[in-house]
């Protein structure tokens, strides 16, 4: 619903930030998107190994809603980055660096999810929203979420 010509607007319009700030904001978003897939795959591999004892491409594809060739391509990328080791006929295993990344990702997710729960968001929505948000918040914001959660409890009780 647009406003008519000649009618004053009551909403305050946010001014554009300077060019450097704008560029930095978009750079951070691009970097977060790049890391998002890596984090999600590494965390899923860790979860599958913990829950079912192995991480198979077919299981990853099913859980991520993608094709097996898509998973295979990403696994090659993760291996080249040093996060996983693929052993033929045995599956996918995390390297120590991959384990570290999976743990960091899991912790970020938990901090965001707990924060949303304290705000009163339902558990199902908090879990789902945290999955997207965890990749796009700075360490400063995570620290603030954690401090707020510790001050106000760990869930909406």
Curated annotation (Swiss-Prot):
Pfam families: Fe_dep_repr_C, Fe_dep_repress. The keyword Transport does not apply. GO terms for cellular component: cytoplasm. Residues 34-95 form the HTH dtxR-type domain. Its main location: cytoplasm. Keywords: Activator, Cytoplasm, DNA-binding, Manganese, Repressor, Transcription, Transcription regulation. SUPFAM superfamilies: Iron-dependent repressor protein, dimerization domain, Winged helix' DNA-binding domain. One of its GO terms (molecular function) is DNA-binding transcription factor activity. Homodimer. It contains an N-terminal DNA-binding domain and a metal-binding domain. Belongs to the DtxR/MntR family. This is Transcriptional regulator MntR. It comes from Salmonella typhimurium (strain LT2 / SGSC1412 / ATCC 700720).
């Amino acid at each position: 619903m647009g406003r008519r010509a000649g009618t004053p607007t009551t909403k305050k319009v946010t001014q554009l930030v300077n060019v450097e700030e704008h560029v930095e904001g978009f750079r951070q978003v691009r970097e977060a998107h790049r890391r998002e897939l890596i984090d999600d795959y590494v965390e899923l591999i860790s979860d599958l190994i913990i829950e079912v004892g192995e991480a198979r491409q077919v299981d990853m594809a099913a859980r991520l809603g993608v094709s097996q060739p898509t998973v295979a391509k990403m696994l090659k990328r993760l291996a080249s980055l040093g996060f996983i080791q693929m052993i033929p006929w045995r599956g996918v295993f995390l390297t120590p660096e991959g384990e570290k990344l999976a743990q960091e990702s899991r912790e970020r997710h938990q901090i965001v999810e707990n924060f949303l729960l304290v705000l009163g968001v339902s558990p199902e929505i908090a879990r789902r929203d945290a999955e997207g948000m965890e990749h796009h918040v700075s360490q400063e914001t995570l620290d603030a979420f954690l401090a707020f959660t510790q001050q106000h409890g760990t869930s909406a009780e």
